[in-house]
Amino acid sequence: MRPATLRQCFGVCIGAVLISSCSTGGQTVDSADSEAGARWTNCVVSGAIEGRQIRIVSTVAPITSLIAQVVGESGAEVTGLVPEGTNSHTFEPPPSAAQVLEAADVVFMNGLVLEEPTRDLAESNVGDDTVLCELGTSILPPEKWIFDFSFPRDGGKPNPHLWTNPPMAASYVDVIRDVVSQLDPGNADDYAANAEELLRIIGELDSAMK
């Protein structure tokens, strides 16, 4: 497959992969040692959901698309809170999002201080057993956070756009697969197969870009 075709395929699979026209503010990073921070980083599943399809809530469009590719046609409900093309750095969730978050079995966010208003709303509305998972924060420890011209270190916010990096996007897929498989073990084989195919595409794209 030619590189151009690979890029197109990967774009279809994960949505607007290269959306990065965002600006940053001066908010400081929350402590990763806090109890709430650990919950988001560890992505702990307390038990499987029985008797119904799992309910998944996510934030930015690229992450929502990755999740949709992994769950496939399992029947899992996937709701993305941030409309495609929206500046996720300035997005404020509407009041109606509280009800969506309250019903969620898992909330996937990017993390890395990207969606703080949505994170705050989630923490105020989700149940004790809801899985809270910041994909970026879970795979990239603070000492490896990336700061650059648009995201200076003194601003306190790292560059959160890890999904534009194929190996890191692959790590997102691994975490998503593991979490939804624990929540819905009856569809775990399908989730694994879907993730394997997506990882294959990501790997081919990575090779073509080198």
Regions found by a protein language model. Give the residues of each.
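Bacterial N-terminal signal peptides that target proteins for export
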Residues: 1-12
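Extracytoplasmic metal-acquisition and chelation regions
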Residues: 11, 22-210
